Amino acid sequence: MRPMMQHHPLRTLPALSLCCATLIAPPALAQAEAAPAGTAATTVEVTGARFRDQPGRTSLSGAELARVPGAGGDPMRAIQALPGVATVDDSSSEPAVRGSRPFDNVYFVDFLPVGYLFHVGGFTSVFNPNLIQRFSMASAAWSPEYGQAVGAVFDVQLRNPRTDRIGGLLDFSLTGANVLAEGPLGRELSFFVAARRSWFDLVADSAEDQEEGVSFQLPVYTDSQARLLWSPDARYRVRLDFSTATDRIEYTVKAGGKAAARDPLVTGSSNQRQSFATGAVVLENDLSDTLGVRTALGQMRQNDSFKLGGAGTARVRTDTTYLRQQWQYTGWRGHELSFGGTLESRLLDVALDFNFPRCTEFDPNCDISTAPRLFTDRRARQNRADVHLADRWQLNPRWVAIAGLRLQRDSWLDRDAAEPRLGLEYSPTRDLTWSAGFGLHSQPPAAEESFDVIGNPKLAPIRSRHAVVGVSQRRAGGWSWRSEVYAKDFRGYAVADPVLNYRNGARGTAQGLELLLKKDLASGGPRQGWGALTGFASLTLSRSRRTIDATGEQFPFDADQPVIATVVANLPWNDRWSYGLKWSAHSGSPYTPVIGTNGTWPDGRVRPLFGGLNSQRLPAYHRLDLRADRRFTRDFSAYFELINAYNRQNVAGYSWNAAYTERETVEQLPIFFSFGLQLKL
């Protein structure tokens, strides 16, 4: 099977289903990205508006991101084109940011937490693309408002409902359809309701890889969002927000195939299901011209379950109730103050009957058939609280100082933390800004690592230090550029332990240089033709390493890609047509090679002998995506995409036979065509 980013058992084992799916029919699955967009003039706006109180941030317009070629109209899929973001496989857009893992990130949508942001391993996001107004990413030393993460903070802003009339949208693509209805309900009330369902499972019932002996049902996903907004005046707003997402995939491993021969216990039917549902009431009140507050009270339920052949079943249900509040005060001359806090209570319900290999990213030899069988069915309550304070101080017209502090308490781990965040900005001219930031961050261990019976309740959090220095400049004609140098270290990664199940026993480092060159529409310039060409080019040079404390062994991080380059261009040719391209390339991802055999397992299977952890690399990756948008009428438009236009045979990994004597290459997406239609109502 291909290398996988996620190694925690309750995360990794369900991901086998996604691996099987992408090995068999990657073109069909990748088309789940599709969502149409119009053909208006396109620029990709990269600013720091949402995280302007800290360096190391990027903000992008959702409408513009939706037209990045290869994203299928989904703004969130386009984030992989940003500097510092690594993805190891075409089948997933889940981002590994600046040397951290995808599950080291935290996600918020309009001040509210969400269960997950991407369907079925990252093929498409869980929010209607027509609702996404802005996307922001903080990748180092971010504001103390955000915690419980050492990777990055993703903050999505949805637009409010229209208030002029009842209207909507219909979106159709090769893989699914979504519908949006919105409008006013009187003078002070407005609403939107959106729903989406994939339909490639209705077109192709199943697929099979005969050599691997795996047949599967194509994955099914749904999502929905709803908002009821009450705005009695310009200073006071109350909204009710709801969102849901579901994902399901099923497959069967047949006896006699390669997959069953390598690990017999996976033989039989398997499935994975995940879902979340969240609802919240949010009050936003501008108490004066200098003081504002927003408060959110909400609840979220997450369900994750899977069955893996004869290896067993697992179910995890999490019910979270939270209260968040954020104050903003600008009445103190030269200061922008932000302060608030969060109370969170989480009920974790775990039922497990499974051969449980305690695999982490530090264990290449993960065999399910020989793993111990574990049973548990119990609940646990986790309570967390935090307070934070930040000040953006305009020292003079050129200098800005930023200081913040986050205090948090975790009753589950019985630990307290104080995390300072510091920043400095210097603008010698109106268009040139130097910035620097430093922050301490922490993240609790994964639930399966700290849950008793299967984990270690005494695990300490992962801790990280972030430092970043950057410079940005705006130039004439719509040109701008930005560069950042960053360094991160991570301490307290969990490793398997035969007595404690897990212990804190590994650390990591990440350093890099990022460069972004961007072209926007020039003020007063043409809006069509070659003079309206916009886009950006990004380059990341980085190094990410992991170290096992007990042995001192060092090796590259799973998503270590020393060179990442991306070019995105958009050309609004006329009122009806616009064109775009995206070319991306990166160093091959590291993997742990099989260098021979090492006897047999107790059941007689050949036992592989692995080389050094991540000691070899896949071939370099590169791909070209093309896009054309066509507006037929004011309300009807379409897009057409050619993915992997020159049919580069990028390598996803390698598959071995049961004797580990023959290796086959597993390829990523071939060339394929996709399209989508949009009708405004």
Report each predicted region and the residues it spans.
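Gram-negative outer-membrane beta-barrel transporters
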Residues: 394-400, 487-489, 504-593
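Structural signature of Gram-negative outer-membrane beta-barrels, strongest in the C-terminal barrel
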Residues: 243, 330-336, 342, 376-488, ...
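Flexible loop and strand-edge segments within Gram-negative outer membrane beta-barrel domains
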Residues: 217, 237-286, 297, 301-320, ...
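Periplasmic N-terminal accessory/gating domains of Gram-negative outer-membrane beta-barrel systems
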Residues: 47-143, 153, 157-160, 514, ...
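Membrane-embedded beta-barrel scaffold of Gram-negative outer-membrane proteins
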Residues: 294-298, 304, 427, 434-435, ...
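Surface-exposed extracellular loop regions of Gram-negative outer-membrane beta-barrel proteins
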Residues: 303, 349-367, 426, 430-468, ...
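Transmembrane beta-barrel wall of Gram-negative outer-membrane proteins
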Residues: 173-197, 212-250, 271-293, 331-337, ...
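C-terminal beta-signal and adjacent terminal beta-strands/loops
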Residues: 533, 585-605, 621-623, 629-681
